[in-house]
Each structure stands twice: as C-alpha cells, then as structure tokens.
Amino acid sequence: MGKTIAINAGSSTLKFKLFEMPQERVIAQGAVERIGFKTSPVNIRYGVDHHYQEKAVVADHLAAVNIVLDELIKLRIIDSYDEITGVGHRVVAGGEQFHDSVLITDQVLKQITDLAEYAPLHNPANAVGIRAFKRVLPHVPAVAVFDTAFHASMPAVNYLYSLPYDYYQRYGARKFGAHGTSHRYVAVRAAKLLGRPLETLKLITLHLGAGSSITAIDHGQSLDTSMGFTPLAGITMATRSGDVDPSLVAYLMKKLNISDPDEMLTILNTQSGLLGLAGSADMQELEARYDEDSQAQLAIDIFVNRIVKYVGAYLAELQGADALVITAGIGERDARMRQRIADRLTYFGVAIDPTKNQVSGVERDLSTTDAKIRTLLIPTDEELMIARDVERVAQNQ
C-alpha cells in the first residue's frame, strides 16, 4: 500500500491530489497559485472537512513542490517523503510519439520539452513540474499521462487535414485532440453506470468547461474529437474561438495590422469565445444575464449550437449512440445548459427528465424512461485516472 500524487503543473500553478492506492482513497488535494509572484496562495484540503490556507513566497515550481510536501508532513497527512511511492504528471501534448502513459526518463522528458510547439501554453509548464519533483523525489517512479494519448486510436480519415500530405509527414500537421484523460475516465464510468462492458458501447462524451471538447467513442476507442492540432479548435469556449475559417484569420490580421501570428493566436485563445461574444468568460454570469441580455443569450445559444452540430456529426459517424456523457465544470453544474442541449437532440431520441436534471456534480442517469439514447451526468476525475496509470505503468516496469 502506497501513496500516489497526481500533478497538474501550469505556468504559475501547481495543483495536486494525493491518493492512497490501490484503494483510490483521496487523502488530500490542493494547489499553489501565483508561483513567482510576491505572494502565492497555498490551499490544501484533507480529512473530512479540513482546509489549510496560507500565503507564502514561492519563487519557482521547485519551491512549490517543497512547500506542498513539507505541509503534508506538518499537517500529519504523511509522516515522510518515503510514503509517496508514485508521481503522475498531466502532460497536454504527446504528439505521435506517445500513445499511452509512460515512465518518465531523461529521454521522455526531452521529448515532452521538444513537443512544446504543439502545446506552447502547457508542455513547458508540465516539464517544469516534472523536473521539480525529480529534484525532490529522485527515486520515486514518475509517470507522464498525456491528454492526447486516448485519441491515438483515431483513424487517419479523422486526424488528417486536407493539406499537402508532406506537411503531415514533415511537420506533424494533424489533429491530436485534448482532454483525453477526462474522456477516458467518464467513458469507463459510463460503462459501469450502464452495466455493460465499455467494449460494447458507442458513446459521445461532452467535456464542457472553460476549455470544451466532444469525443466520439466507439467500443472504448476514440474515433473522433472536436479539438484539433491544438486545443483551440472545436466548439465555442470560455475565451477560445473554436473553429474559424482560416481565411478569416488572414483577413483580420490584415485589417488589424498584425504581422506576428502569435499576436493573432493570443486573440483567438484569450479574447474570443464567450468573452468575445458577451464580455464575460463566466458561464454562471452569462446564465444570470440570459433572460435580460441579448448578447449573453446569443453567446449561450452559439455555444449550444456548436455542441449540437458536433453531436449530430458524431451520431452519424458512430451510426447511433448508446449514451451522451456530460462532464466538467459547465456540464456538471449547469442544469439549464444540459436541458438546452437535450432539447435540441430530441430527434435522435435524447430526452432528459427535468426532475432528475436538478442536480449538480453528482453521478446520475438523467434520461427519461423512454429515451433511446441515455444521457449521463458523470463528474470527471482526471487525477484518479492519472493515479491509476501510475500504478499500472510502474508495476509493468
């Protein structure tokens, strides 16, 4: 029996969840934020309802790792570093090199760093977190769990763009997708909820949060997904545009006198989506404004419309589905949003019970008794999937 810590390192954050394995019991979870700023909030939740908070000076991720582990000892959550027997790191981009979670070696770390051009906002930060933990826990097995790995099963007909083929061969220009760990987790849970083997099911999973993606899962394998070469593609998101005609991007660069493509990408990634349409990236705020504010209404209606288009396309690709699975922040907490989506899909046999739908963040079958396609609400747990992969990969070495 050991303890496995799942890590999600951002450019200025370090989020963690500590599990007792193989029981999969959550012992503690928390985050260090604003790393490198004057003061950094440190939050740790543990036990039934204990919550530790402080503000510290955290110069870098190495300091953040030391603070987290030292506080776990001070709070008597662990007695020593030796109790941690595995570390799992979320890594956004695995490219074509990584089709599964892997034990992190120096070569693997170099490859993760080299893949930064596929996820410039994420992979460098993920690599920094890996190095920091390697410094503090050098002899503990560390495993990289890639957001893209689940989508490695996509066929070429779905991952290739209609560009000169040598762009794919020379530059890796293809769809990779994202949120794979979340889609994989909720698919596994959906199978349990439906009481059927995952390998017999056709599912469409909707990860609806600040970043949103939709995946068609055919007998346990990712068949297609809405995000593309980067997590910018797909449906409308909090601050990301989703799908846009490339010619429009070139047109706007001329109109805005933008010569640096990174400047245009910043607009598409951080100033677009719900924020660009309605002035707020917060779906809860837009919901509050929906009945009185035409821009909030338009933004939400566009969000729903993009979702419905992808679900419709995936129903055609899959030739039907056993269930829609809704997850992530918006999906888990916004009952009105779930109802809107279901109402637009009644033609396909989707129907949810309004009474069952009045829940937030709990696992439940929301369907009416006569629905042809089940609608499942399943809170995601990417950290648990990471911890499971640490156990699996470390044991197989």
Swiss-Prot record:
Main location: cytoplasm
CC per GO annotation: cytoplasm
Gene3D superfamilies reported for this sequence: 3.30.420.40
Pathway assigned to this chain's UniProt record: Metabolic intermediate biosynthesis; acetyl-CoA biosynthesis; acetyl-CoA from acetate: step 1/2
Binding site for substrate: 90
Residues the record marks as active site: 147 (proton donor/acceptor)
Top-level EC class: transferase
Record's subcellular location: Cytoplasm
Lineage: superkingdom: Bacteria
Binding residues annotated for Mg(2+), in chain numbering: 8, 382
An annotated GO BP: acetyl-CoA biosynthetic process
Keyword terms of this UniProt record: ATP-binding, Cytoplasm, Kinase, Magnesium, Metal-binding, Nucleotide-binding, Transferase
Transmembrane helix keyword on record: no
Annotated cofactor note: Mg(2+). Can also accept Mn(2+).
Residue sites binding ATP per the record: 15, 207-211
Keyword GTP-binding: no
Cofactor: Mg(2+); Mn(2+)
Gene Ontology MF: a single term: acetate kinase activity
Quaternary assembly: Homodimer.
Family, per entry: Belongs to the acetokinase family.
UniProt-recorded name of the protein: Acetate kinase
Organism: Lactiplantibacillus plantarum (strain ATCC BAA-793 / NCIMB 8826 / WCFS1)
Gene transcribed to yield this protein: ackA
